[in-house]
C-alpha cells in the first residue's frame, strides 16, 4: 500500500510558475506537468470521496494557479505515454462546456462516443498544450480534443501516433500450478478517433506550432 501511494505521488500532476517577457511586459504562466493519466481505481471503487485522479488533481492545481494571478496556463504532456482513457475525457471537460471528446470503435465496428456531460468549466483563460514524440494514447486524445474544439494551442513535436486501446489479461490465473508465473498478455480491443473523424494511429497529433528538436539537426 505504501509503495503504491509513493508511485502515485511520483506520477501525480505538479504545478509551477514561469515568467515570460514579451513586448516589455512580463507574463506569469502557470505550468502543470502531467507525466501520465492516472486514477486511484481502488479508492474510487471502494467509495472513497477523496480518491486521487488526474482530473481532480489538475482542477485543484488550476484553482491554485489562478489564485496566484497567473496570465495563462500550460499543460505539459511531453513524455506522457497515456494511461486511463476516462481521465483524458474528464480532463478535457475542465476546459470545455460539454460535448464529444473521442470516438472508440471496437472490433465489431461499433462506435461509442465518449462525452463530457458536465457543463462546468474550471478554466476559461489562455491555454497551451505542450507535446512531443513520446506523448501517446490518452495524451493524444486530450491534445486532439483541445485542438478540435479550438480551445487552446498545441505546441511542440508531432505526437507518438498510438490510436488503439489495449486490454491487459493476467495469465497467472490460468496456470495449472499456482507457483507458475505466466505473465500478462496485452491485446488490442479497439481503435479511437478524434471528434473530427481523424485517427491518430501512426499519424499522431500535429501541433499548431511546431518546435525544432534535436532529431531535426
Locate each region found by the language model.
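Acidic, S/T/G-rich, low-cysteine, solvent-exposed domains in lumenal/extracellular/periplasmic regions
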Residues: 168-170, 181-183, 205
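Short acidic, Pro/Gly- and aromatic-enriched capping/linker segments at domain boundaries
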Residues: 179-191
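Conserved functional hotspot residues or short segments at active or partner-binding sites
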Residues: 195, 199-217
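Short hydrophobic-aromatic micro-motifs
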Residues: 30-32, 187, 200-201
Amino acid at each position: 500500500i505504501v509503495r503504491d501511494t509513493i508511485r502515485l505521488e511520483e506520477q501525480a500532476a505538479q504545478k509551477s510558475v514561469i515568467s515570460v517577457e514579451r513586448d516589455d511586459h512580463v507574463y506569469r504562466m502557470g505550468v502543470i506537468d502531467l507525466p501520465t493519466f492516472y486514477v486511484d481505481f481502488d479508492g474510487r471503487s471502494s467509495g472513497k470521496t477523496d480518491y486521487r485522479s488526474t482530473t481532480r488533481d489538475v482542477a485543484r492545481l488550476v484553482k491554485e494557479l489562478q489564485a496566484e494571478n497567473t496570465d495563462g496556463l500550460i499543460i505539459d504532456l511531453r513524455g506522457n505515454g497515456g494511461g486511463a482513457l476516462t481521465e483524458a475525457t474528464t480532463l478535457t471537460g475542465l476546459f470545455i462546456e460539454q460535448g464529444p471528446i473521442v470516438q472508440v470503435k471496437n472490433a465489431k465496428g461499433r462506435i461509442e462516443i465518449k462525452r463530457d456531460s458536465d457543463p462546468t468549466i474550471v478554466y476559461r483563460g489562455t491555454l497551451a498544450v505542450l507535446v512531443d514524440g513520446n506523448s501517446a494514447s490518452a495524451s493524444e486524445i486530450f491534445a486532439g480534443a483541445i485542438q478540435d474544439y479550438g480551445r487552446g494551442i498545441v505546441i511542440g513535436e508531432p505526437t507518438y501516433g498510438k490510436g488503439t486501446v489495449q486490454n491487459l489479461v493476467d495469465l497467472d490465473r490460468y496456470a495449472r500450478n499456482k507457483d507458475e508465473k505466466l505473465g500478462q498478455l496485452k491485446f488490442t480491443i479497439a481503435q479511437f478517433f478524434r471528434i473530427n473523424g481523424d485517427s491518430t494511429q501512426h499519424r499522431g497529433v500535429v501541433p499548431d506550432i511546431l518546435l525544432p528538436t534535436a532529431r531535426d539537426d
